Amino acid sequence: MKDDVLKQQAHAAIQKKLGYAFRDISLLRQALTHRSHHAKHNERFEFVGDSILNYTVARMLFDAFPKLTEGELSRLRASLVNEGVLAEMAAEMNVGDGLYLGAGELKSGGFRRPSILADAMEAMFAAVSFDADFNTAEKVVRHLFAERVRRVDFQNQAKDGKTALQEALQARRFALPKYRIEEQIGHANDSMFVISCDLGELGFVCRAKGTSRKAAEQEAAKEALKWLEEKLPLKKKKK
């Protein structure tokens, strides 16, 4: 009984953050249900929610950056629509408090796992569209992403981390970085990778985690780029 009350409170808070109140609360519950908890879980919702999210953010960027090419817009969208951003957003909304997880996932801290949080966000966008319509779901996404789109740094974010680091090193006439898997934690379908990024002659090595090798490499590259730009900023050419 106490758990039910806590879940209801969590769901009320989540709806407030979404800016949308469900008429059929069972849709929200399913959106927050992991497959480890019940057969009626959120994976099919994710499929729809992912499409709603990608379209809406694409349209927001299309309108905000009229001079960007298709490739630049795609890279910019990828910097906003990814597991890291969605998990961060979910954490800000305390989505983990409203999740339904199986005993194993609950014990292993699944309510904090980025992949589970990100999936729940996508599933909720679908749930809104089922409860109302596509336009309402689009408004929810716009509400949540407006500030992130407004403050996105095009110069840095339009390129993925590895590309930006490579170009920054080449501009300074340094060798390309080397990436190496330091550790792989967990099972095949639920792994966490620890990747190192070595800048060689610069004597800097950083490590980052990700739920895939690619994601971890991108995070390590971003960390290395941040260090490089702080330690060896390029001098701006005089006009």
Curated annotation (Swiss-Prot):
UniProt domain RNase III: residue ranges: 11-133
Cysteines engaged in disulfide bonds, as pairs: none
Keywords assigned by UniProt, alphabetized: Cytoplasm, Endonuclease, Hydrolase, Magnesium, Metal-binding, mRNA processing, Nuclease, RNA-binding, rRNA processing, rRNA-binding, tRNA processing
Catalytic activity annotation: Endonucleolytic cleavage to 5'-phosphomonoester
Pfam families: dsrm (PF00035), Ribonucleas_3_3 (PF14622)
Binding annotation for Mg(2+): 46, 119, 122
Record flagged with keyword tRNA processing: yes
Cofactor(s) essential for the protein: Mg(2+)
Active site residues per record: 50, 122
Xref: PANTHER family: RIBONUCLEASE 3 (PTHR11207:SF0), RIBONUCLEASE III (PTHR11207)
Task of the protein: Digests double-stranded RNA. Involved in the processing of primary rRNA transcript to yield the immediate precursors to the large and small rRNAs (23S and 16S). Also processes some mRNAs, and tRNAs when they are encoded in the rRNA operon. CRISPR (clustered regularly interspaced short palindromic repeat) is an adaptive immune system that provides protection against mobile genetic elements (viruses, transposable elements and conjugative plasmids). CRISPR clusters contain spacers, sequences complementary to antecedent mobile elements, and target invading nucleic acids. CRISPR clusters are transcribed and processed into CRISPR RNA (crRNA). In this organism endogenous ribonuclease 3 and Cas9 are required for correct coprocessing of pre-crRNA and the trans-encoded small RNA (tracrRNA).
Protein name: Ribonuclease 3
Annotated organism of origin: Neisseria meningitidis serogroup A / serotype 4A (strain DSM 15465 / Z2491)
